[in-house]
């Protein structure tokens, strides 16, 4: 959740039950100005229908990528997480492409934030970004060779630490204040090691792990 000084909130994905969202917002659902959804998978979109039934606008660029401008004082621009051929690397269970989008979110109190999750890489470069919230799912050294398909599931459509570090380095400027990594694999990531690695390429920015 992004919350401004007036108490207005923008939800970043909605992959938990609606009651947890309400509780997390201290039941002040009327202060939710909107929600952005990166892709259709349930762990990012579970509460979409509930939010829409409550009259809360939900931006789903994977269904309709028309420019919306933003919600409240939050200006929003979507960015497709595809390769140079237009293909999305994130997939559904059957292996078909799952369109996934990142977002540039701007607010007078915050500046410009980049939110990206569930992608193997980001081919874009961005200017004047103040905050980056990005998924850094796993470290190659912790991925064990197996034949169960779990290894492929972890790798497919998710970002490895060194790839993430390269992305951060390419987008680090004097404007960057914070880097927050999220969506860490429970069994294939060491948070402290990840933070240490990202700090080496993030300039003077603060680096932390999302709770």
Residue ranges and their predicted role:
Residues 1-25, 99-118, 131:
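Conserved beta-strand hairpin/beta-sheet module of binuclear metal-dependent hydrolase folds
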Residues 14-16, 40, 63, 81-83, ...:
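Active-site metal-binding loops of divalent metal-dependent hydrolases
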Residues 50-110:
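Metallo-beta-lactamase
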Residues 69-83, 111-113, 119-121, 128-150:
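Conserved catalytic scaffold of divalent metal-dependent phosphoesterases
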Residues 20, 45-46, 123, 141-142, ...:
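Glycine/Thr-rich phosphate-binding loops of Rossmann-like dinucleotide-binding domains
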Residues 126-210:
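Cap/insert and terminal regions of metallo-dependent hydrolase folds
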Residues 8, 17-61:
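Active-site metal-binding motif and surrounding structural segment of the metallo-beta-lactamase
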Residues 7, 29-32, 55, 110, ...:
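A general structural motif
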């Amino acid at each position: 959740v992004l919350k401004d000084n007036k108490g207005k909130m923008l939800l970043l994905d909605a992959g938990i039950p609606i009651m947890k969202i309400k509780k997390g917002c201290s039941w002040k659902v009327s202060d939710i100005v909107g929600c952005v959804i990166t892709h259709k998978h349930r762990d990012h979109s579970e509460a979409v229908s509930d939010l829409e039934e409550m009259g809360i606008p939900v931006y789903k660029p994977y269904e309709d990528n028309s420019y919306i401008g933003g919600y409240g004082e939050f200006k929003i621009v979507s960015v497709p997480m595809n390769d140079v051929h237009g293909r999305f690397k994130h997939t559904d269970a059957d292996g078909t492409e799952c369109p996934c989008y990142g977002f540039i979110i701007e607010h007078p109190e915050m500046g410009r934030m980049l939110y990206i999750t569930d992608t193997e890489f980001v081919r874009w470069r961005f200017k004047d970004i103040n905050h980056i919230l990005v998924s850094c799912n796993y470290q190659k050294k912790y991925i064990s060779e197996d034949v169960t398909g779990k290894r492929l599931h972890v790798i497919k459509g998710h970002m490895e630490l060194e790839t993430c570090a390269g992305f951060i380095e390419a987008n680090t400027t004097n404007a960057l204040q914070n880097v927050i990594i999220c969506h860490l694999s429970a069994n294939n990531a060491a948070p402290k090691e990840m933070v240490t690695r990202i700090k080496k390429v993030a300039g003077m920015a603060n680096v932390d792990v999302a709770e």
